[in-house]
Amino acid sequence: NFVSDENKILYEVEKTNGAISKFAFEKAGPREKIYYDPSKIRAGIVTCGGLCPGINNVIRTLVMQLYHNYGVRHIQGFRYGFQGFIPSFKHETMNLNPESVQNVHNIGGSILSSSRGPQDIGEIVDCLERQDIRQLFCIGGDGTLRGAHEIALEVEKRNLKIGILGIPKTI
């Protein structure tokens, strides 16, 4: 069930003059060869900003995919948005596994709670280092994705091997 790196989605579906499109997108999906060893990594999930339907379903699907399809056994939920990374807020993380998210798709809101507003990017990356997080999934809207981008820039600046992934949600 792996997707080959050779699989592409053409930018232009139809060409009238018979020319081949030069532009294509990489097809999404699981790859046979991946950068991280899933059995050795710790993943993190955070939800930020306003709530919208389906957030718990996204959390559940992430946990199930990471656990069952990739073999990731250490998944942390960071509570109350980006505040969850800042020690002075004293928010505890939540261990996520298939049992803990089994029925969350039937519950409204976010099991991780949420918050709005920026936090210190340096402190967030410090927390990722302390907790040995190698993949961080940020679920949120424009502000969250801007924050995820800033986190990724700081990770790159420090030359860390942490993947920052943005999952858009909005109403």
Regions found by a protein language model. Give the residues of each.
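N-terminal phosphate-binding or glycine-rich loops at protein starts, especially the Walker A/P-loop
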Residues: 33-86
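Short, acidic/small-residue loops that bind anionic groups at enzyme active sites
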Residues: 152-171
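Short beta-strand segments
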Residues: 46-47, 77-79, 113, 138-140, ...
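Short, solvent-exposed amphipathic alpha-helical segments in soluble enzyme
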Residues: 60-64, 93, 129, 152-156
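Glycine-rich oxoanion-binding loops at beta->alpha junctions
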Residues: 2-36, 85-136, 144-145, 167, ...
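A generic structural signal for alpha->beta connector loops
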Residues: 72, 108, 161-162
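Short glycine/serine/threonine-rich phosphate/pyrophosphate-binding segments
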Residues: 52-62, 85-86, 119-124, 141-150
